[in-house]
Curated annotation (Swiss-Prot):
<keyword id="KW-0312">Gluconeogenesis</keyword>
<dbReference type="GO" id="GO:0005829">
    <property type="term" value="C:cytosol"/>
</dbReference>
<feature type="binding site">
    <location>
        <begin position="9"/>
        <end position="11"/>
    </location>
    <ligand>
        <name>substrate</name>
    </ligand>
</feature>
<dbReference type="GO" id="GO:0004807">
    <property type="term" value="F:triose-phosphate isomerase activity"/>
</dbReference>
<keyword id="KW-0413">Isomerase</keyword>
<keyword id="KW-0963">Cytoplasm</keyword>
<comment type="function">
    <text>Involved in the gluconeogenesis. Catalyzes stereospecifically the conversion of dihydroxyacetone phosphate (DHAP) to D-glyceraldehyde-3-phosphate (G3P).</text>
</comment>
<dbReference type="InterPro" id="IPR020861">
    <property type="entry name" value="Triosephosphate_isomerase_AS"/>
</dbReference>
<dbReference type="GO" id="GO:0006096">
    <property type="term" value="P:glycolytic process"/>
</dbReference>
<dbReference type="InterPro" id="IPR022896">
    <property type="entry name" value="TrioseP_Isoase_bac/euk"/>
</dbReference>
<feature type="binding site">
    <location>
        <position position="175"/>
    </location>
    <ligand>
        <name>substrate</name>
    </ligand>
</feature>
<feature type="active site" description="Proton acceptor">
    <location>
        <position position="169"/>
    </location>
</feature>
<feature type="active site" description="Electrophile">
    <location>
        <position position="97"/>
    </location>
</feature>
<dbReference type="Pfam" id="PF00121">
    <property type="entry name" value="TIM"/>
</dbReference>
<feature type="binding site">
    <location>
        <position position="214"/>
    </location>
    <ligand>
        <name>substrate</name>
    </ligand>
</feature>
<dbReference type="GO" id="GO:0006094">
    <property type="term" value="P:gluconeogenesis"/>
</dbReference>
<comment type="subunit">
    <text>Homodimer.</text>
</comment>
Amino acid sequence: MRRPVVMGNWKLNGSKAMVTDLLNGLNAELEGVEGVDVVVAPPAMYLDLAERLIKEGGNKLILGAQNTDTHNSGAYTGDMSPAMLKDFGASHIIIGHSERRDYHKESDEFVAKKFAFLKENGLTPVFCIGETEAQNEAGETEAVCARQINAVIDAYGVEALNGAIIAYEPIWAIGTGKAATADDAQRIHASIRALIAAKDAAVAEQVIIQYGGSVKPENAASYFAQPDIDGALVGGASLDAKGFAAIAKAAAEAKKA
């Protein structure tokens, strides 16, 4: 059985006090919780503080990050390299998020390049895919997701997905309070796994596929009850220790062997 992964994307939120309170709270809430990997991705300038607090808390959490560059050094003002992220203990790196694709005009091909560079540097890509509301209403969800995934497969082979995480996030559900139903999310997750299985069944069977988009303690269990939903990429709800821990506990409970 695939081990669920629940990841908190803090986006552009945080302060020293907030990071300290949130991670101390999570360390307490997750005491004794097993069967789930819990990852947090704070803003880059708080990675050092987060790494120290995670260690002090007994390493119940895994440190992640929200972005990477496609170089490890050089004249790339404002960017972060995989080598730098590793130096701070970050292992799970979000790429392809709709906010990066939209605000920073990151193409499928550029996201695929980031994906490959993370793998080359021994890090775990958390590869976000998903459709807009207009694409959803036009019945294009599966085609959009396939296009985004195939940008990686066509350039680097289906084997590149080994050890990676795919996060299906319908753009219309991110931070809106709207959410795909558990049945609808399962249908898309199953189509993603089938797309990969058509090329390599073993890769498809092991790849983690998270759902993201207004996941909350109140609805988390319904998603995790689905066979192809292997965790969640959580936004706003990850900024509350008790609520985020409840989501992680729901994943652990639902995916018990």
